[in-house]
Regions:
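Short, positively charged
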Residues: 117-146
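DNA target-recognition patches
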Residues: 20, 32-66, 238-242, 250-253, ...
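A short beta-sheet element
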Residues: 69-72, 80-123
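Short helix/strand-bridging catalytic loops that position acidic/His residues to coordinate divalent metals
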Residues: 60-68, 105-106, 152
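A short glycine-rich beta-alpha junction/loop motif
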Residues: 99-107, 138-161
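Short Ser/Thr-interspersed hydrophobic loop/turn segments at strand-loop and sheet-helix junctions
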Residues: 20-30, 44-52, 73-90, 123-134, ...
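Non-catalytic DNA-recognition/assembly elements of restriction-modification systems
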Residues: 1-31, 159-260
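Short, well-ordered loop/turn elements at secondary-structure boundaries
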Residues: 38-40, 73-77, 103, 149, ...
């Protein structure tokens, strides 16, 4: 496995330490929660949602059935490492992760020295580290990383000046990203205030304006079911737009282009494909 070769390479470096030497690593107990109606209970994020750019709470858990709930929240000076499924992905903790119940499928990485936070984040974001995390002896075959595995991950430690420079840049990137998310939330709030939208309107509309149509009536008359016409949230959005000044996207942009389809041939190349 390629990852195992990276492990050997890192362990050959004289200036390497174990991840467990630099951080406390732990994992909450497995959680089997009971869901509640939207807006009631404790907001919950899955591992996938934690890595989303714009996550939305889709599941709310009944508080009495969340054991040791205080251990399932995260702090902004921590790192989170995916340990199940697609292992080895790392993320910083951002403002929208706070005050949410976070799945046990993410290991909590708590730096022992705050000065090493930036270096740890930068190093663990590299493809080099991800290959290490996915190495066979660390669970690549079973797609799972235990706390004991993560503690043994080799971390290369260059000179203090190098780590400080890279670490400060990484920390600044995290702070600026956090600021950008806050500014985006403010922009959305301003837009909602301007058009008179309410963030809870979608939930209210689905219960208040949702229509019911007989499938037999549709099939009998060979009609086409346009779901937009029967979803209250969509109708609300249409009404909000019609009540405001608006214009077509084509009139507001210089061009709208859709590239043609092309046949892809995969192989060794310097051209990445997304």
């Amino acid at each position: 496995r390629d990852g195992y070769g990276f492990v050997l390479l890192a362990n050959q470096c004289k200036n390497h330490v174990r991840l467990g030497d630099l951080a406390d690593i732990w994992q909450p107990s497995r959680l089997t929660g009971y869901t509640m109606p939207d807006g009631k209970g404790l907001p919950f994020f899955t591992a996938g949602q934690v890595f989303e750019d714009f996550p939305r709470v889709r599941k709310w858990l009944a508080a009495p059935f969340v054991p040791q709930a205080d251990t399932r929240y995260v702090k902004q000076d921590w790192l989170l490492l995916s340990c199940s499924g697609v292992v080895g992905n790392i993320t910083a903790v951002y403002p929208h992760h706070l005050d949410k119940i976070i799945t046990h499928d993410l290991l909590r990485i708590v730096p022992k020295d705050a000065n090493e936070y930036g270096w740890l984040y930068a190093y663990m974001k590299t493809n080099f580290f991800k290959q290490i995390a996915q190495a066979a002896q660390y669970g690549h075959m079973i797609k799972h990383i235990e706390v004991s595995h993560a503690s043994e991950f080799p971390i290369i430690m260059p000179e203090n000046d190098v780590r400080k420079t890279i670490g400060e840049t990484a920390r600044r990137a995290v702070l600026l990203r956090s600021k950008s998310w806050k500014m985006r939330d403010e922009a959305f709030s301003t837009l909602e205030k301007h058009v008179g939208a309410c963030r809870d309107s979608a939930t209210q509309s689905q219960t208040a304006n949702q229509g019911e149509v007989s499938l037999a009536a549709i099939l009998q008359n060979r009609l086409r079911l346009d779901a937009d016409s029967f979803v209250g949230a969509i109708k609300d959005v249409d009404e909000l737009i019609n009540a405001c000044d608006w214009d077509y996207l084509g009139n507001l942009t210089s061009d709208v282009v859709e590239p043609t389809r092309f046949k892809r041939f995969y192989g060794e190349s310097d051209v990445p494909f997304v």
